[in-house]
Amino acid sequence: MLALLAAALLPERDPRGHKGTFGRVLVVAGSLDYVGAALMSGAAAVRAGSGLVTLCVPASLQPVVAGRVPELISRGLPEETAYEIDAPAAAAEIAELPADALLVGPGLRPGRGTTAVVQK
């Protein structure tokens, strides 16, 4: 019953559509201790119906997340220290990426770099 109600609320997908047609989500997430949070957030965006999901993690974690969820595009962000993003460089890269929605935070370590990226 709930599944039928949910399906009725969702718009019909254009059969001629492509990944870009169904929305682009940018997820900025993850740290050494919380790689799973980044992966689960990206997978949730895919499962929710997003057409194109880019998962941005600290550069040293990019090889760890690449290919774990095949539907995700993974991208490494510049780091200030191991596993912590360099705020100015990361914010500049994030600003260049196309997105209809932005999710920032799951699994990011609290710190100056994280706070600065969120503020920018």
Specify the residue positions occupied by each region the protein language model found.
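Small-residue (G/A/S/T)-rich helix-start motifs and N-terminal tracts that mark the onset
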Residues: M1-K120
